[in-house]
UniProtKB/Swiss-Prot annotation:
Keywords: Cytoplasm, Protein biosynthesis. The lineage of its organism: Bacteria, Pseudomonadati, Pseudomonadota, Gammaproteobacteria, Pseudomonadales. InterPro entries: Ribosome_recyc_fac, Ribosome_recyc_fac_dom, RRF_sf. It comes from the Bacteria. One of its GO terms (biological process) is cytoplasmic translational termination. One of its GO terms (molecular function) is ribosomal large subunit binding. Gene3D superfamilies: 3.30.1360.40, Ribosome-recycling factor (1.10.132.20). Responsible for the release of ribosomes from messenger RNA at the termination of protein biosynthesis. May increase the efficiency of translation by recycling ribosomes from one round of translation to another. The gene is frr. This is Ribosome-recycling factor. Pfam families: RRF. Belongs to the RRF family. The keyword Cytoplasm applies. It comes from Pseudomonas fluorescens (strain SBW25). One of its GO terms (cellular component) is cytosol. It is found in: Cytoplasm.
Length: 185
């Protein structure tokens, strides 16, 4: 019973960390990275499809992405989708592929992206704390129903607190790394 609560809390905290990592992947740094285009949806046979399903995205050099559509006739649609995605990116259509040069980040955009990163980190921290609260509530319910003793509850609470502390440390570390990437010129 206690192990199930701990495993559930750990799995949910891990999902929060993965969600944070995904959110950080969407925040553009000065370097080219395929995950920047992760949110781009391309109209494909009547439905919006993720760009990764209709094109291959590779890093040509540190500031350039190369996009090759799986179907040549889709290149125009991919081009329009990238331009209209609100990422401030302008692809260059070379007929068979698109080249996307990453514009240098201004100090203002760097600060904006840093705020965005901090906000995502705070959301992850709140999620981890909520998971902790849920797990502790489940433990209290077990004590109330006399399924576990108060000593077992204290030990389990200490374990859950350790999981929470570890998750928050990982969030802090990831946030510091992202901020360092963003502020590097």
């Amino acid at each position: 019973m206690i192990n199930e609560i701990k495993k559930d809390a750990q799995a949910r905290m891990q999902k929060s960390l993965e969600s944070l990592s995904h959110a950080f992947g969407q925040i553009r740094t000065g370097k080219a990275h395929p995950s920047i285009l992760g949110s781009v949806m391309v109209p494909y046979y009547g439905s919006d499809t993720p760009i990764s399903s209709v094109a291959n995205i590779t890093v040509k050099d540190s500031r350039t992405l190369q996009v090759v559509a799986f179907e040549r006739n889709m290149l125009g649609a991919v081009d329009k989708a990238i331009q209209s995605a609100g990422l401030n990116l302008n692809p260059t259509n070379l007929g068979e592929l698109l080249l996307i040069s990453m514009p240098a980040l201004t100090e203002e955009t760097r600060k904006g992206f840093t705020k965005q990163a901090r906000s995502a980190a705070e959301d992850a921290r709140v999620a981890v704390r909520n998971i902790r609260r849920d797990a502790l509530g489940d433990l209290k319910k077990l004590v109330k129903d006399k399924e576990i003793s108060e000593d077992e509850e204290r030990r389990a609470t200490a374990d859950i607190d350790k999981l929470t502390k570890d998750a928050e440390a990982q969030i802090t570390k990831a946030t510091e790394e992202k901020e360092k990437d963003l502020m590097a010129v």
